[in-house]
Every structure is written in structure tokens, then in C-alpha cells.
């Protein structure tokens, strides 16, 4: 959630930044109005509580002195009723404030470019030149089917569209990538964690998926459990409602998991191959930091994922996302896009974000700063998306005869 006190004192800045995320000023007007109304209603409630306490004390004194307290009892009863009404009004305004604030995304960092969509993202770095061939390179689905690595037909038979079966060398390469990514990230100081794939609604609320993006989640019928869309959700929430000692920060973690997404709104996009799946694997980085550490840790996470791609010999570029392409919880995001010669374009393979204190406010993750409890900053990003890395290797390491060379660093993992 955004900081409502900052919204109050920096209203114009919030309007400008959130306009870049397609948030109308009228929503912020309503949010601020409700926030101010709630403060007034709380003052009224506190006034009734003070009157109740004072009159209750007065009643006790007069009763012990043997005085007539019938009129005072009537006043107390009237005030008690008014107090109950005021308390109910406060609860209604608190609920209204929550409903509005839960739908407002994070504000952007100052260096995030204003833009409408992915076409306005800015390339800030290119690593390795796009792979050149003396033959026309094939796309991954053609290579995968001809080699027997990717079985789209049986994936669809088992589960429907956007599911794939990996077989033989395809499955072995996928497993090798997971182990290599975990080892690479661990060597960079990220602690390996293993988490549940089913989480509660409160957990998803903490990282911002609920309530706004429920349509993209898979829910267990009749239970408060959802399949995770990314391991960012359970890993970040390991510290939900926790006060961390300052000397423990930063906390840096890596996690392998399967991920599950409905892909609502993606109809007609990437219908062939493995680019966009309902179930996919990812190795994630999650960091929890002090506010003054998060920029440095963001750079570490970007470097980790980029160096991992470089070690695999995969050409890629760093894209600074514009305001209109930023995620709900993100204040700043760098996408790493890998070159796919079969498609003849770059495709996202990692998205690394600093959410500042947005998720921490929702999940109540704090650290002890002297005598004060302060909100942490949380960061997350892929290092890397396993399926897309497999695709990138297939397309960049293909040979004219349709076979695929295995990158040197992966051979001992095969």
C-alpha cells in the first residue's frame, strides 16, 4: 500500500507519478477524502470515549458518596449509544479506505521514464551481440518437436492449451538449468529456501496479488489456498508480520519453484511453443533490506541475473521499464530480455523490481532501527525463468542439421 501520510503532504507528486500507471486523479481524490474523513470520525469516537471515561469515573465517586446518580446513568447510557454508533462509523470508513487503498498501485521512482507501454521502455545496456548463423535459424517449437524434447500434443492432451511435456534431453536440460541457476545464485550470497506452492489469501495480499489480480490465480475450491504465481509470494512472506533486527539486513534468498498463472488477458498471444505457459518453472531472487540498502541490492540482483545469462553465452539487454509497463507493486523494474534468433527479437527472461516499502506495508515487515520499528524495502526478480532460458539455449545453440549444442557450463550438470 502507498503511504497515506505522504499522499497528504505530496499530493501533486503522487498524482503525476500514478498517472503514469494509468491511475485517475479522481481515485486519489476519493482516497485522500476518505482518509481525512476517517481522521475526523476517529476524533469524534475519541471524544465520546473520553466523555464515557470521565462520566464513569464521576459516577463511581458520587455512588460511593451516596449521591443520586440516576441522571448521570441516563447520560452515560445516551453517550454509550452514541459511542457505539461512532465506533460503527469508524469501522465503515476504515473498510472503505482499505478497499480504495488496496486498488492503488505503488508510486514510481524518480528515474522511471513516463510512458504508456512496453514500446516506451528504455534500453540501458546490451550484453553480447545477437547470435549470427549462416542458415535460417528455427524457432524453439520446431527444434523441440523434431528432436523429441518438447511434446506439445501430449501436454494439451493431459491439461489443455499452454501446457508442455519435456522429454529426454529436453527434460535433462531443464533439470540442469535449475541446478546451475541455484548454484550460481547461491555463490552470489543468496540463501536457498524451499517453500510451499499453496499459500493463503493473506500471503497473496502481502505481495500485492490480491485482491486486484485474483482472476490470474488458480484457487483451491472451498479452501483459502491458491497456487503460487511466483515464489516471490511465499519467500517475501516468510517475514510477514515480523520485526527483523537491523543487523540481519539485508536478507537475500533464492528459490526454485513451479509457478501457476491463468494468463488472463493473454488470449491470442504466444499461442505456439513455451513462451507463455499456465505452469512454468522459475528460480527467483528475493531480498529484504533497509531503505538505504535497496538500490545497491537491486544492482546486485540485476548483475547476478545478467552474469548468469552471460555465463550461458546468451545475448541479452537491460530494459528500464516505463511507468505504464510497471507492475502493480513495483517502484522500479529492470527487465532482462534475451535474444531469440528464431523469432528474430528480444524476449523478457527476467524482471527485477524494487517495491520500496509498498509490500512491506501490506505484509507488515519491519526492522528495529534503534527504538523505532521501520518498514523494510523488498525486492524480487527471476534468475532465471527456466523455460525461457531453455528456449534461448535451443535457438542460440542450434546447428544447421537441427541438433543443439549444450553450453559448456551446463555439461557437468547433464
Swiss-Prot record:
* Keyword Magnesium annotated: no
Q: Where, subcellularly, is it found?
A: Cytoplasm
The record's keywords, sorted A to Z, are:
Aminoacyl-tRNA synthetase, ATP-binding, Cytoplasm, Ligase, Nucleotide-binding, Protein biosynthesis
Molecular function (GO) terms listed?
ATP binding; serine-tRNA ligase activity
Give the UniProt entry's GO cellular component terms. cytoplasm
Pathway(s) of this molecule: Aminoacyl-tRNA biosynthesis; selenocysteinyl-tRNA(Sec) biosynthesis; L-seryl-tRNA(Sec) from L-serine and tRNA(Sec): step 1/1
| EC supergroup of this enzyme | ligase
> Domain of life, per the record?
Bacteria
Which amino acids does the record list as binding ATP? 261-263, 348-351
Q: What Gene Ontology terms for biological process does this UniProt record contain?
A: selenocysteine biosynthetic process; seryl-tRNA aminoacylation
Q: Where does L-serine bind?
A: 230-232, 284, 382
Q: What is its EC number?
A: 6.1.1.11
Q: Which Pfam families match?
A: Seryl_tRNA_N, tRNA-synt_2b
What is its quaternary makeup?
A: Homodimer. The tRNA molecule binds across the dimer.
Protein's job: Catalyzes the attachment of serine to tRNA(Ser). Is also able to aminoacylate tRNA(Sec) with serine, to form the misacylated tRNA L-seryl-tRNA(Sec), which will be further converted into selenocysteinyl-tRNA(Sec).
Q: What is known of its domains?
A: Consists of two distinct domains, a catalytic core and a N-terminal extension that is involved in tRNA binding.
Please state which protein family the record places this protein in.
Answer: Belongs to the class-II aminoacyl-tRNA synthetase family. Type-1 seryl-tRNA synthetase subfamily.
The record ties this protein, via HAMAP family, to: Ser_tRNA_synth_type1
Q: What is this protein called?
A: Serine--tRNA ligase
The gene behind this protein is serS
